Amino acid sequence: YGKLPNHKYMINWPIEGNDYYINLIEMSPEERGKALEYAKHYTMCFVYFLQHELGYNTLGLADDEYPTEDKLPFIPYHRESRRIHGLVRFNLNHALNPYTQDEKLYRTCIAVGDYPVDHHHTRYHGYEELPNLYFHPIPSYGLPLGTLIPKDVDGLIVAEKSISVSNIINGTTRLQPVVLQIGQAAGALAALAVKNNQKIDEVSVRDVQNAILDAKGYLLPYLDVPVTDVKFASYQRIGSTGILKGEGKNVDL
């Protein structure tokens, strides 16, 4: 459903589409290879359905995107992975009501997000017994730096979908706009640790936040103040102290 330039489309349809459930972590390498082949075949069946059942017979796999024999991407898109025990654990309550929680995580944010909590459970056998977590809108939120730092491992920074978040809130923090910001913050944290000869958990969160602001990144979702505004960084810094308390919005609310 994702329309791209040059008359191309991204195939990513969760409802009776090309979602495929696999728990790769608990498989052997041989089992993983076989399971991923099944997943590829499932995607190709969906392409066939689009072409022959829905009548989109002019659509096919692009031959100028990936240098692979089957024209599919190098790796599958994983919606969820194993997660660390971080210095902090971000959950749904922190996003819904950031200023009433015991942990003042909004003071340490390094990325923002606003995608609904979205879990694709229908491909899981027995999904009927699971809670309905499909596309529930939530307020826009800030993600704290401590989710990237393992609690019991020195010298390691975690990014992508392995950060310290709850299963439910992973339905929004997993989105690429968020994980791209996580990668930026991880890079800033690593660079500052090396530059200042510090351990990862010794680096000042304010230094990381300043690096992100210098790169025109967001700490908190004050979207009514664009990055081009001369007061943008000031509002972000004041919000990170708790003096300014912004109300997160979502387009569906």
Segments (PLM) and residue ranges:
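Flavin (FAD/FMN)-binding glycine-rich loop and adjacent Rossmann-like elements that form
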Residues: 1-213
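N-terminal propeptides
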Residues: 210-253
